[in-house]
Amino acid sequence: MFDSFIDNNKDEIINQVCELIKIPSVSNESANSSHPFGEECTNVLNYILTLGESMGFRTKNIDNYCGYIEFGEGEDLVGIIGHLDVVPALENDGWTTPPFVPQVRDGKLFGRGSIDDKGPVIASLFAMKAVMDSCSISKRVRLIIGLNEEKDWKCINYYKDHEEWPSIGFSPDANFPAIFAEKGILSLELKHNFSIKNYEILDINTNNNAINVVPKYASITLKKLDNNDFDLKNNYSNISITTLENNTFKIESFGTAAHAAHPELGENAINLLVEFLLDNFEFENSFLKDIYDNGLFDILSPKFLAENPLEDESGVLTSNVAILEYKNNILVIKINLRVPVTISLDDIQNKYSCLLPDLKVNRLSSQEPIYIEKDSFLVKTLVDIFNKKSGFNSSPIAIGGGTYARAFENFISYGVTMPGKKDMCHQVDEFVEIDDLILASKIYAEAIYKLSK
């Protein structure tokens, strides 16, 4: 019923995703009250609201925190929740082409936000248009657009304080066929005294890495305090040592970025740097060696947490050591954990607090897990639609990622990454396969119709 409309608008769908990618909408929480997440986030919101209005929808800008695009009549409200903020991207991170200059090649659309989440938002918008122009429904359908998803969710919290809550829906910000469970998310800050014998630590840098990204870069700059020559064992292909003036030098570590929900897909530059330091230096205390030996840098269920891996049907606990900071002889380590749905976030934090004496542990943020029965109406309906439209025979899955599906009851994440495809969220050369995006739009149209008729 809806496929022909989406096929006929394929070029326009891709064009509109490109227009969104051109806006470097990295959320900036230090912005002013007129632009709570920065001018670029305001610009991208106004762009899509103007687009929605031109397509015949009702729209609303909610104080530049978020907005929505809506059609239909009725008391009940079906929701689709996406976001237009993106994680940072720099050309010197290794992008083949500039991250905010969209490019189509080999059937893929490249650019920051192409799959997370600008492409899926546009796919959802055109799915709404296909339904609106083709049939009548008995409920309202609202596409809610956030601007702070990659950080603290202040946008969706603002929405919840000021606007009507949908009673059912999905977020196009993960994987097909559908997500029945999302792990809990726990971000911790660890602090402890740290110094290296015979060296002054001038700087430790992780290049402003986001806590939900596996760090691709880490460095430490040292000044030697005696006149002895330094002899460092560098058996690491991804470690670089640069001699500077005045008896100083910089050690740099180079890894591979990935989403913190899948740390196994990346190579953590902090972990590499720590291993190098332990191989080459002596320390004023045993802190770094102790946390390393206890498994703090393990990416799968750090061994100090339990004798056996912590896991359930939602998967195994994962850990991403994301950020290092250093000031006044204090080393700060920021960690992002994805915790199986049956395990208490408080219990995990307590185990970190008990890891070592004098270790200070603070909770930076947390999100409780979500779990919806696989045989619920919502999960079964969306999985059936996906399998029918795609030709797959897939079952619902659990993920470590955190999506807006957590914002409301009776919501799940739904696409756009297809089964068996690599998750390109937060990665260098992020892309979405064009055929997959068009198929996702067709799937969303059918889902909107089934949930709102």
What is each residue range found by the language model?
Residues 2-110, 134-137:
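Acidic/His- and Gly-rich active-site-bordering loop/insert found
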Residues 48, 261-328, 338-347, 359-453:
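An extended, acidic, His-containing surface patch that forms the Zn2+-binding/catalytic region
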Residues 58-62, 241-244, 321, 397:
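Short beta-strand
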Residues 77-145, 151, 164, 427-428, ...:
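Active-site metal-coordination/substrate-binding segment of hydrolases
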Residues 84-86, 144-153, 172-177, 418-420:
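Acidic, glycine-rich active-site loops and adjacent beta-strand->loop/helix elements
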Residues 138-146, 204, 289, 363:
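Beta-strand segments within the central parallel beta-sheet cores of soluble alpha/beta enzyme folds
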Residues 150, 156-340:
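Midchain, well-structured core segments that form catalytic/ion-binding scaffolds
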